[in-house]
């Protein structure tokens, strides 16, 4: 056995002592001063960051939102009934993060990314911060690819491009959610991943949306983030940011994603509630001063990023691909008042709006889109050739029809040209009607728009336009399938395609009388 002499032993001990890391990690502890309505006032947290996760006793977390000289105001993320005055609070040194990745597709999660669908734990280990800075101007690319919703009226008159923010605004019960759900269903087979964020809705409504998505095979490419009406205001405030982070995962890897916020009015209400409870000074309509920033920092994250950004983000793994995150925020108005605080804010942030009207909805025109004030500021550049060529006449026909219809109420005798224009407008209005859960392909839209533009509907009674359209599409699918496939593939419009569409409609009309 080898003998160690005392000098060697002391030398080893000295080396060990030199290597020993005695710098301990000091973390401050605070004490709860008061708890009320999900807001906790804490004394003694010196080194807390804004937006940092703080840990209460019992494994409950909170979010530091008010940093004052001698106290910290935090919002509890979850149940606060077990929190009491005098309990200890610790800082975590972490900003709030949520799970991201392909494994979330087909799942229903809460505002923090915890699964709530009873299908077990998430298989992803990747997490990313909830709050992120939007890509800068240099990292972006202009919108140039279409994002088809499957609705004739939307895709012709207010086209949406990948990376655009298009507001869907209207009173309650005007079909806002229906339009968004159909847009998700229409992305089946396109490779676009979808995120549906439900904010402040009834649990039964959220369950109904999930069931409809499952029935139409759309849950495979969709993540549902749910912060229901019964969830704390903190969850309703955070859910849109969590959903956006999940969507950015796909965008930053050169893929396309679509996110729907249903609806941001309720997020603004939740934030107003939190701000008032934190005793922040109220402004217009009792909203805090930064309610514009609340929505702008969220919606600016929806963008189309260029190849360099994607390549840099993925460390060269993905090359030559652009990524996009398209946002469809929904805003609920009160009695059609679009000049209220939150609607005007979001209108100014987004790249256009689809305005849904109660009067049109009740008149059976669904989707109930007002073509006059609905607009897409950047989507025109992303439209396919066939939609751009054939869709122009539709907006004009509808605008003229609305104007003449108002005038015709007072005039008893109308000249022939005016009467023809009115009848054409009436048929186009009927043609724009579309049932829910029945999205159309580009070729199908092109066919019916061609029929309207070329006067093939002029001898069809206005009341029979909808059945005429259904019969025409059925005939085209069986007899002219190759033509439709060709249009869907390229979206082009030339003399050959125009001749093919004309031949299809003429042959159809020769077999049936309308």
From Swiss-Prot:
GO cellular component: plasma membrane; proton-transporting ATP synthase complex
One Gene Ontology term of the molecular function aspect: proton-transporting ATP synthase activity, rotational mechanism
Topology of this chain in the membrane: Peripheral membrane protein
EC nos: 7.1.2.2
Alphabetized UniProt keyword annotations: ATP synthesis, ATP-binding, Cell inner membrane, Cell membrane, CF(1), Hydrogen ion transport, Ion transport, Membrane, Nucleotide-binding, Translocase, Transport
Compartments reported by the entry: Cell inner membrane
Residues reported in the UniProt entry to bind ATP: 170-177
Domain of life: Bacteria
Major subcellular site: membrane
Catalytic activity: ATP + H2O + 4 H(+)(in) = ADP + phosphate + 5 H(+)(out)
Transmembrane parts of this sequence: none
Site (Required for activity): 374
Similarity remark: Belongs to the ATPase alpha/beta chains family.
Purpose of the protein: Produces ATP from ADP in the presence of a proton gradient across the membrane. The alpha chain is a regulatory subunit.
Subunit structure: F-type ATPases have 2 components, CF(1) - the catalytic core - and CF(0) - the membrane proton channel. CF(1) has five subunits: alpha(3), beta(3), gamma(1), delta(1), epsilon(1). CF(0) has three main subunits: a(1), b(2) and c(9-12). The alpha and beta chains form an alternating ring which encloses part of the gamma chain. CF(1) is attached to CF(0) by a central stalk formed by the gamma and epsilon chains, while a peripheral stalk is formed by the delta and b chains.
NCBIfam families reported for this sequence: atpA (TIGR00962), PRK13343.1 (NF009884)
Name recorded for this polypeptide: ATP synthase subunit alpha 2
Protein encoded by which gene: atpA2
């Amino acid at each position: 056995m080898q003998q160690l002499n005392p000098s060697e032993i002391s030398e080893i001990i000295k080396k060990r002592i030199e290597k020993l890391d005695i710098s301990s990690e000091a973390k401050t502890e605070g004490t709860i001063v008061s708890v009320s309505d999900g807001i906790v006032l804490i004394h003694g947290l010196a080194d807390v960051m804004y937006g940092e996760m703080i840990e209460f006793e019992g494994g409950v977390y909170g979010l530091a939102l008010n940093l004052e000289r001698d106290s910290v105001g935090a919002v509890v993320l979850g149940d606060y009934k077990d929190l009491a005055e005098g309990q200890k609070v610790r800082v975590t040194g972490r900003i709030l993060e949520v799970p991201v990745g392909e494994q979330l597709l087909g799942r229903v999660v809460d505002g923090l990314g915890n699964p709530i669908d009873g299908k077990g734990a998430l298989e992803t280990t990747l997490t990313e911060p909830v709050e992120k800075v939007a890509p800068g101007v240099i990292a972006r690319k202009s919108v140039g690819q279409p994002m088809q919703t499957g609705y004739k009226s939307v895709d012709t008159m207010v086209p949406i491009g990948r990376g655009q923010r298009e507001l869907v605004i209207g009173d309650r019960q005007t079909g806002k959610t229906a339009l968004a759900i159909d847009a998700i269903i229409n992305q089946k087979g396109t490779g676009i991943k979808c995120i549906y964020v439900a904010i402040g809705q009834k649990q039964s409504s959220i369950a109904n949306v999930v069931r409809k998505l499952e029935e139409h095979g759309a849950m495979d490419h969709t993540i549902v983030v749910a912060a229901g009406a019964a969830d704390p205001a903190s969850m309703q405030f955070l859910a849109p940011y969590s959903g956006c982070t999940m969507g950015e995962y796909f965008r930053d890897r050169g893929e396309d994603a679509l996110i729907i916020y249903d609806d941001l009015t309720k997020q603004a209400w939740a934030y107003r509630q939190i701000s008032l409870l934190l005793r922040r000074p109220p402004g217009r309509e009792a909203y805090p001063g930064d309610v514009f920033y609340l929505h702008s920092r969220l919606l600016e994250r929806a963008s189309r990023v260029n190849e360099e950004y994607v390549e840099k983000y993925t460390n060269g793994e993905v090359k030559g691909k652009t990524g996009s995150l398209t946002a469809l925020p929904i805003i609920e108005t009160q009695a059609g008042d679009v000049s209220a605080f939150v609607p005007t804010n979001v209108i100014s942030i987004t790249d256009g709006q689809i305005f849904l009207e109660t009067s049109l909805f009740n008149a059976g025109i669904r989707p109930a889109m007002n073509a006059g004030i609905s607009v897409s500021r950047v989507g025109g550049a992303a439209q396919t050739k066939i939609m751009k060529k054939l869709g122009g006449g539709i907006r004009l026909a509808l605008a003229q029809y609305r104007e003449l219809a108002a005038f015709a109420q007072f005039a008893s005798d109308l000249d022939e040209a005016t009467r023809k224009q009115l009848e054409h407008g009436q048929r186009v209005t009927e043609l724009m009607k579309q049932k829910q859960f029945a999205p159309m392909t580009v070729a199908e839209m092109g066919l019916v728009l061609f029929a309207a533009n070329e006067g093939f509907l002029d001898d069809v009674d206005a009341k029979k336009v909808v059945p005429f359209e259904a019969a025409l599409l059925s005939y085209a699918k069986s007899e002219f399938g190759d033509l439709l496939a060709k249009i869907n593939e390229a979206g082009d419009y030339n003399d050959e395609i125009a001749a093919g569409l004309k031949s299809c409609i003429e042959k159809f009309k020769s077999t049936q009388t309308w």
